[in-house]
Amino acid sequence: MEEGFRDRAAFIRGAKDIAKEVKKHAAKKVVKGLDRVQDEYSRRSYSRFEEEEDDDDFPAPADGYYRGEGAQDEEEGGASSDATEGHDEDDEIYEGEYQGIPRAESGGKGERMADGAPLAGVRGGLSDGEGPPGGRGEAQRRKDREELAQQYETILRECGHGRFQWTLYFVLGLALMADGVEVFVVGFVLPSAEKDMCLSDSNKGMLGLIVYLGMMVGAFLWGGLADRLGRRQCLLISLSVNSVFAFFSSFVQGYGTFLFCRLLSGVGIGGSIPIVFSYFSEFLAQEKRGEHLSWLCMFWMIGGVYAAAMAWAIIPHYGWSFQMGSAYQFHSWRVFVLVCAFPSVFAIGALTTQPESPRFFLENGKHDEAWMVLKQVHDTNMRAKGHPERVFSVTHIKTIHQEDELIEIQSDTGTWYQRWGVRALSLGGQVWGNFLSCFSPEYRRITLMMMGVWFTMSFSYYGLTVWFPDMIRHLQAVDYAARTKVFPGERVEHVTFNFTLENQIHRGGQYFNDKFIGLRLKSVSFEDSLFEECYFEDVTSSNTFFRNCTFINTVFYNTDLFEYKFVNSRLVNSTFLHNKEGCPLDVTGTGEGAYMVYFVSFLGTLAVLPGNIVSALLMDKIGRLRMLAGSSVLSCVSCFFLSFGNSESAMIALLCLFGGVSIASWNALDVLTVELYPSDKRTTAFGFLNALCKLAAVLGISIFTSFVGITKAAPILFASAALALGSSLALKLPETRGQVLQ
């Protein structure tokens, strides 16, 4: 009996050993089956969606995640938990692996995990399309990117170029147009706003500076975020910030609040250029990219023309205003500020109908979302071309395994602002790390060279484009001063002045018992004169001064002759009653000078149209570097003609010439920046370079305008040297014509 029992026990143990070996081989076979199902490009596991012949014999576990030979075995007793106790010495797993989280140690089973299917839906682990940190070498990631770039280019060619790209072209063009408008808004409203807000010269300078400062911050901020959160989402947010604060700035009354609103408006629009060019380029095949990105640049010009035309049409109409007491005034220049927010608002509405960049989806492991967008591009273009029957044949697309560590905060962890703070810090760290990677050994030389090109181009371009109008105003002032009439030693008694005096100098005059009622004084100076028993009522003045004058028994009623207009003058027994309210500063207001600002800006922006057309047609034929260097050399040569600009018309002509030849270099620089950096760094690098561009613009404007009225040699020398240096640096960059988008 005992011998039979021992035989039976030995038989049971042998059967268990056989069953155990069978299950091990079954698990290996299932893994091999899943490897066949796994997409060659996306490395996603489709075990939940596709059936194989092996599944009937070897059903997969419920969670569907396999890690090589480390598959789970059922416990012999069946009562223990597989997650905690269901393993033996030969087939060891740990609890986290059962939940889909890979082991931390490398080697053995870890090698299978490095090449295996990415994890999906894992809390606290890696997102879909991501590999374990450090599990894939940089060489493998580079190889994956090259494969993705080649496949993505092939897919774009299959999708074709048609209605979808042209629709996106006009949508993104509105966003770029909003950036062009923003640059001109402050300059156009200053002649009118300076009186309403009582702006001193330092206040006006700060207002012009704050716009560039906001755009500099916005370019870096939104450019970095767009590589992490998506092009479309960040562009929508940035345009929303711009439109909201541009709207507020048209209603606020104080200088401080207006300055704050324009700062945040600039921060919002700063993300437009780096995101728009990156976004559009990722829908363009290689043979179309250079040309159509250059066509897109035309909308920046349209923005400048729109701003100049609206300023010309709106600001001089003083009837387009209302006033609520003396505290709230809404003049025509505020209507202009409001109208300038329209391109941004329209861009937001149109952008909501467009999809996210499929290249961004693929870079972040979102295969299905990218496939849907590319199918939309294909179907839209095929229907427009009359081929609705054509089917999008792509089934699998390569995705990049991410190495960034993701952080997920449970809903019961701390307060809501603590969770948001942790997420913000995590996102900020990722953005900063991505920015620093632009200076890695692989990209350091390109980044430093591009910094030099962007800085020199911006320094010379913005410096000269602001210097031109200032020089025109200086020439106007010189011509105006040459027509000044001088009245020496006049004696006037018992006369009533009720008309306008303009551009006059009265020296050594004597005025006895005269009345100045309803008088308008513009650029009038009284020097060494005597006023006795005179009466001033309802007098308005601009650029008017009394120097070394004496007033005896004189009354001033309802005038704007404030104390600072009396220079070294004596007032004896004189009275000021009910001085005019408003700004006590001497401002020029609107007039012929303001019209000239609009006109010059209109011509200057319109003059770049021929250069835009030429650069778009030749960009893919002669290459980016030749276009950039050639345009820079022509711009450098055009600077030497500035020495012949001794009249107003000559300076306007030279401004148009410089703008027309320099725009091609900007178009080439935008295309080159897009193509030199990979998709995961594209908007980050573009945003940083654009921020550097705004810094160089501030320096160029400050330096160039300081020489107005002193010499023209210094601006010519600085601009020529900067352009020559930029063109020489550009020739050392790699040519990107004919290359697929990284």
UniProtKB/Swiss-Prot annotation:
UniProt KW keywords: Cell projection, Cytoplasmic vesicle, Glycoprotein, Membrane, Neurotransmitter transport, Phosphoprotein, Receptor, Synapse, Transmembrane, Transmembrane helix, Transport
Cytoplasmic domain ranges by topology: 1-169, 227-233, 284-294, 356-447, 620-626, 673-685, 732-742
Tissue: Widely expressed throughout the brain (at protein level). Expressed by neural and endocrine cells of brain and spinal cord.
Gene3D superfamilies: E3 ubiquitin-protein ligase SopA, MFS general substrate transporter like domains
Main location as per UniProt: other
Region of interest (Interaction with SYT1), ranges: 1-57
Biased composition (Gly residues): 122-137
Pfam families from the UniProt entry: LD_SV2, MFS_1, Sugar_tr
Keyword flag Transmembrane helix: yes
Chain intervals for the UniProt region annotation (Disordered): 40-145
Its membrane topology: Multi-pass membrane protein
Modification Phosphoserine, positions: S80, S81, S127, S393
One MF annotation (Gene Ontology) recorded for this entry: protein kinase binding
GO biological process: one example: regulation of gamma-aminobutyric acid secretion
Subcellular location: Presynapse; Cytoplasmic vesicle, Secretory vesicle, Synaptic vesicle membrane
Other comment: Identified as the brain binding-site for the antiepileptic drug levetiracetam/lev.
Protein name per UniProt: Synaptic vesicle glycoprotein 2A
Organism field: Rattus norvegicus
Recorded name of the encoding gene: Sv2a
